Structures are given as C-alpha cells and as structure tokens.
C-alpha cells in the first residue's frame, strides 16, 4: 500500500536508501 508518491512507507532507515525513516515515511 502506497500512501503517497513522495513519501514511501518504511520500517527502518535502510528501507529509504539515502533517506531516513520517520513516522513510517521516508524523509
């Protein structure tokens, strides 16, 4: 399930590549 095209859902920073996981979203 994708909540937004900009903020991907995540469980950890590693799910976001060079971004960080914050409150379930990559920022």
UniProtKB/Swiss-Prot annotation:
Record's GO cellular component terms: extracellular region
Compartments reported by the entry: Secreted
Top-rank lineage group of the source organism: Eukaryota
Expression by tissue: Expressed by the venom gland.
Protein name stated in the entry: U18-ctenitoxin-Co1a
Similarity remark: Belongs to the u18-CNTX family.
Entry keyword set: Secreted
Function statement: Not toxic to mice by intracerebroventricular injection.
